[in-house]
Amino acid sequence: MAKQTLGSLLSSGFDLKGKRVLVRADFNVPLDPQGNITDDTRIRASLPTIQALAQAGAKVILTSHLGRPIQKDKATGAIQIAREGNSLAPVAVRLAQLLGQPVAFAPDCIGPEAEAVVSSLENGQVALLENVRFHPEEEANDPEFARKLASLADLFVNDAFGSAHRAHASTAGVTAYLQPAVAGYLVEKELQFLSGAIENPQRPLAAIIGGSKVSTKIGVIERLLEKVDKLLLGGGMIFTFYQAQGIPTGKSLVETDKLDLARSLMEKAKARGVELLLPVDVVVADRFDKDANAQTVSIHAIPEDWMGLDIGPESVKAFQAALQGCKTVVWNGPMGVFEFDRFAAGTEAIARTLADLTQAGAITIIGGGDSVAAVEKVGLADKMTHISTGGGASLELLEGKELPGIAALSEA
């Protein structure tokens, strides 16, 4: 079902002036030991929603998690909250700089301190509440905690796509008390690309799936086989497919309990007329190390004591040829161990190919996780049509699953 969005709410003439709007954002940003934000991408991604609400005269109340502050004592089971290094205070400072207006910071997300900050807001002003995960009730989706959080506001906007696959109090629980509950601009964009591009694609539609294990991508591959024209596989998972065909893989990573599954996926692709491409050559190493000895070999000539850590140059050429003329390309997962420069060439070549395709008019979608890091490493993030901000959420949406944080929103 289609969900209400902030865009549709504003265009319908809904008056937000003076309304207290609780916005669940994703400010889970990396901090250095001094508490400085090392990457503000997620904060920038939330700006359109915040600015639209402020311009409409709303009182904007932002909430988010940061890190995993809850630590359980293994021996006693006692819960401790690690506040050090997990406070959203640095985010309030950065947000104020980006918005060009003050951002009031509440030292808690519920209770008298939060209430005082919210009640001091004028129309168009912005406040940020402290980390919701400082309360164990957040991840337990506790109704009473959700009610307290919701009591600060009149309506709810979910703009935290990266947390949409979790049924937590601040992503799903609050919608029981706040209506309308709508998708912010970022969430709307993610749904448009990750769902829309696969349900109603411009064809040919190709998907590139990488990563080390087949087991983590089974759901995605199975769903994509029903939708795509071409499926290109890379990363460590390819060795399970080779071994399923009786090709020796040396010391490469193989999930021996997934050999039958790999065979059935290949058969499914054939039956559906999907062009399934596996690499024809690989870069192998004598050990898993950035300084390992490396050589490029055919997949039929992997030495017994070596392991494959990247796709080879012939595979890159074959993949590039297969992608030519594709109108939509979805990419999730690297082609090799791109953290080691020696085994990053395959991933970087695919990133450059997608950037070229985008320039030629194709829709390119980087579906979250490591492939985003890879594209950023090569400096091509701005050359793609859409870069997903989610990790697990992107994967689950590509699998066709309903995300709790989206399911809880008001119907359009």
Swiss-Prot record:
GO biological process per UniProt: gluconeogenesis; glycolytic process
CDD domains: Phosphoglycerate_kinase
Gene3D superfamilies for the chain: Phosphoglycerate kinase, N-terminal domain (3.40.50.1260)
Record-listed substrate binding positions: 26-28, 42, 65-68, 133, 166
UniProt cross-references to SUPFAM superfamilies, sorted A to Z: Phosphoglycerate kinase
GO cellular component: cytosol
Binding locations of ATP: 217, 308, 339, 368-371
EC number per UniProt: 2.7.2.3
Subunit structure: Monomer.
Name of the molecule in the record: Phosphoglycerate kinase
